[in-house]
Amino acid sequence: MEHVTEGAWESLQVPLHPRVLGALRELGFPHMTPVQSATIPLFMKNKDVAAEAVTGSGKTLAFVIPILEILLRREEKLKKNQVGAIVITPTRELAIQIDEVLSHFTKHFPQFSQILWIGGRNPGEDVERFKQHGGNIIVATPGRLEDMFRRKAEGLDLASCVKSLDVLVLDEADRLLDMGFEASINTILEFLPKQRRTGLFSATQTQEVENLVRAGLRNPVRISVKEKGVAASSTQKTPSRLENHYMICKADEKFNQLVHFLRSRQQEKHLVFFSTCACVEYYGKALEALLKKVKILCIHGKMKYKRNKIFMEFRKLQSGILVCTDVMARGIDIPEVNWVLQYDPPSNASAFVHRCGRTARIGHGGSALVFLLPMEEAYINFLAINQKCPLQEMSLQRNTIDLLPKLRAMALADRAVFEKGMKAFVSFVQAYAKHECSLIFRLKDLDFAGLARGFALLRMPRMPELRGKQFPDFVPVDIDTDTIPFKDKIREKQRQKLLEQKRKERSENEGRKKFIKNKAWSKQKAKKERKKKMNAKRKKDEGSDIDDEDMEELLNDTRLLKKFKKGKITEEEFEKGLLTSAKRTVQLTDLGVSDLEEDS
């Protein structure tokens, strides 16, 4: 099912509850989006649906409204601890957002209780909250929901509570599978009743999603909603009101271009994407130091407890910058994001589309910009063909200020900045090596010297990818970087303590090594001969071109060693035999006669 149109909520064949319509008016949504007008009637007629629609198309309301309508039509009212609907979503941020949208509706229906189960919170408190207040509608991430099904100690029997389940929703299904939640979802499905309505929502249809459809849905109606005015054969995967741009610049120009761009738009709201958590940590601190009048927040997947708070804070801001990884790339609806900036291209092409989709949400306008290195220019055509995502070039700004010396000065003044920069560089190189588009993003073509200058490094890090390479275009600082202190006095004190401990250990180890060297000569010699014999055997097995006279010498030495070990000859005789063997080989070599010729 593809050809659907927008329309008024009142035009639905199955009428909505007056209080649902009232909540929609409060939210400022007088009309349905195509995905909503296609999905809601089917869901309400007890059909399983598998919906594919571009990011920012209004998928959340497409399942929130049917959940409420189906629960309102139940013959038997839900008790406090009976679960009528479950929404599973891949990230905490998306779960928080869905819970917030749902609360706009449930406040009009006090008979329904809702509960949010996500990581970063105390699971014991979640259990107590459910026991006290109930949870007719659960919004959860897969890991926490699976954990709740397995909990027995706190007196929670969730398996019994879900026997009344009417609706299951799997939101961002492709991301659920990409993030490795397949096993958790399968476990959860085993606990749920078969007689239920299931909705699967996704921005892309992959083979893995298709497998999940077969496993979790019964005779589903498939919905694929396209952007208006675009031919089916070339369906654009980003919102039609999104302006996509790219900028080609060298690795050591990129940061200056980014700061110039952000300074010229300080009153706007931006998302800045980096490829790794370490890059977010480093460049987030750098931007804080250089854009003092702008509110800057950082968020990434390794933040366990701060993420929820940071996400909510940024949503409330009128202007500011959120520096983030792909943890913010899917489904998140942040009000009035003006620009999505991709400092690093994502590891796969579909993530590019999802990043861009954080702006131009539900009919609003928005813009996106990706920074590319000269060697990555082919990525533009790749996106146009592979993701149906055309991009327009944005000219390089020529009047930018070089801020890299300031970053270097920050690293020299504080070891924390120096270490963050080194970690960020290493993590970026490692992520680059794993890029899905390896024909375009080739590690061997990367300008490591320019990249190091762009990261404002004081010296090149030691890492396998740089081993054996020379960097004449990179000038390291002329100081011992081990002498750079932490600004934080407590951290510096701990560092000095560790350095002293290492010095002592090194000194003790050197003493032990000297003692080991004073072993009996005969034992050392025997060990050396064993090693020699093993190497000779290995070379022979590998088809080595070792000549016959060397092999004969080795065999003679081995025979002597065996006799010496068995006590058949003395140490003096052993040494004499080795010398005789070596002398004989030299003489024969000088004469040009091999051992085999003499023996014959």
Curated annotation (Swiss-Prot):
Motif window: Q motif: 9-37
Gene for this chain: Ddx55
Short name of one Pfam family: CTE_SPB4
Similarity comment: Belongs to the DEAD box helicase family. DDX55/SPB4 subfamily.
Record's protein name: ATP-dependent RNA helicase DDX55
Domain description: The Q motif is unique to and characteristic of the DEAD box family of RNA helicases and controls ATP binding and hydrolysis. The C-terminal region is required for DDX55 nuclear import and association with pre-ribosomal complexes.
Motif DEAD box boundaries: 171-174
Phosphoserine: residues carrying this PTM: S544, S594
GO molecular function: ATP binding; ATP hydrolysis activity; RNA binding; RNA helicase activity
A single GO cellular-component term on record: nucleolus
Biased composition (Basic and acidic residues): 499-513
Nucleotide-binding in keyword set: yes
Stretch forming the signal peptide: none
Reaction catalysed by this enzyme: ATP + H2O = ADP + phosphate + H(+)
Keyword DNA repair: no
